[in-house]
Amino acid sequence: EESIVRLRTGATGALGERLTGDAVAVTRATRRHPDVRQGSSVRGAIDTTLVATRLAQLRDLTGPDDAAYPELVFDAMIVALSGRIHLDEAAETTPERVLREIWEDRFILEPHQAAPG
């Protein structure tokens, strides 16, 4: 999937590589979330990368190590993915809340998990 996203978006450099990896990861996570009946396809990852790239330019984001990077990805996720996921009818949540959970898993929980040891 990452190679498809890179091909379709032209994402390059450190920022492009990181955006592509994160966009593919969060898009895949929409397919595994228990409240989601149908998650997003690779087109969601393409759109997330494109939106995030444009936002990075508008916000003068310097690279993936910029402190504003995680929030930039969340904003891109909301724009690109909120209309692409379909929740289970019994779920008492919103697409935006589901995307926030996925974002927190990727940007808050994963970086702080201890390495296996």
Name each model-derived stretch:
Residues E1-G117:
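C-terminal regulatory/interaction module of P-loop NTP-utilizing enzymes
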